[in-house]
């Protein structure tokens, strides 16, 4: 699966892998975090398997990199997505909100209190939207963003991830000028720096949240014993 392809022959699969490798290097060297790639070679990985790889490694974040395409040759700019559950009715969610197993690699499973595998992301929608917002802000400072910019959609690659997850369309390969940009190492570096900083900002926001919650708990008066 080569994904989308530009007029000059640039292929989505090649650019996304290049950016992913550079992002891994940046995160590991600057933040000291471990990055797990869903693929590190020219091979096809099914959408469900991508989420399973993240779940199997108990990842804290899931970032899915893509390149957009359009029938309009003038469409341009990056778009950031987080999961939308608008296509799932409240009845479906309530019926399936119970203990289920989440598939992992090698045919193994792990029991967790969430909805069905297809709706695993439901418990992380708010944090996914928070991360997507940070990605949008940081990319906007560095590259051209599409008018749609920050969006929510029920992407299959996101719904199975049992952690905050975002999908980033780095630009439109159907636009000849943007195809040239996407192949540029300078452009790729701006994308990497934007994603790196968004991870830093997201991590800091979680630290602030934990400190606030911890402070609130410590300031609560002790519960009185019943006579």
Protein language model regions, located:
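Short, surface-exposed beta-strand segments enriched in small/polar/acidic residues
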Residues: 1-7
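Active-site-proximal helix/loop segments of hydrolytic enzymes
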Residues: 7-227
